[in-house]
Regions:
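Aromatic/hydrophobic pocket-lining residues that form the small-molecule binding cavity
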Residues: 1, 35, 39, 66-69
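N-terminal binding-site loop/beta-alpha segment at the start of enzyme catalytic domains
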Residues: 2-19, 49, 72
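Short loop/turn motifs at secondary-structure junctions
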Residues: 15, 47-50, 81, 104-105
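Extended hydrophobic secondary-structure segments that form protein cores and membrane-embedded regions
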Residues: 20-24, 55, 110
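Active-site mouth loops of central-metabolism enzymes
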Residues: 23-34, 61-62
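An active-site-proximal structural segment forming one wall of the substrate-binding cleft
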Residues: 31, 35-50
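Active-site groove signature of glycoside hydrolases
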Residues: 46-63
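Beta/alpha (TIM)-barrel catalytic core signal, keyed to glycine-rich beta->alpha loops juxtaposed to Asp/Glu
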Residues: 58-136
Length: 136
């Protein structure tokens, strides 16, 4: 992907501004330092100066590391490296915990959502807290 972006000129300048690039942090890379390292690697592979959205792929409820991971995400946002922060597959309990431990809500929660699985509780919770729902 990075080579294609660079070859087409879409990795910098005015062309870059016309794209929305999202990347996700793998579960095994959660944690403060490992999230920062993984992000740097993603930028290198994408050959970009920033991403439009960086997302936690899964809340890892049995080995909760999302708090430290989120703190790294906030650092990246504050530095202009990731413009929007999101999560994937977070249920209301996960979102509450993240908010209680960091004081922040994600901008987006990407969840499986379709006519046969509407996840009304998750959607309502996100709406109440100003979190956009992105369906996959």
């Amino acid at each position: 992907m990075g080579r294609a972006l660079a070859a087409s000129g879409y990795n910098k300048g005015a062309k870059r501004e016309t794209l929305w690039v999202t990347t996700k942090l793998r579960d095994s890379q959660q944690g403060y330092d490992s999230a920062l390292k993984a992000f740097d690697n993603s930028l290198k592979l994408l050959q970009l100066d920033y991403v439009d959205m960086y997302m936690i792929h899964w809340p890892t409820p049995f080995d909760w590391r999302s708090t430290d991971t989120w703190k790294a995400f906030v650092k990246l946002r504050d530095e202009g490296m990731a413009r929007t922060l999101g999560v994937c597959n977070f249920m209301p309990a996960d979102l509450k915990r993240l908010h209680e431990e960091t004081g922040a809500w994600p901008a987006v929660n990407q969840i499986e959502l379709h006519p046969t699985w509407q996840q009304r509780e998750v959607v309502a919770f996100c709406k109440k807290h100003g979190i956009a729902v992105e369906a996959y």
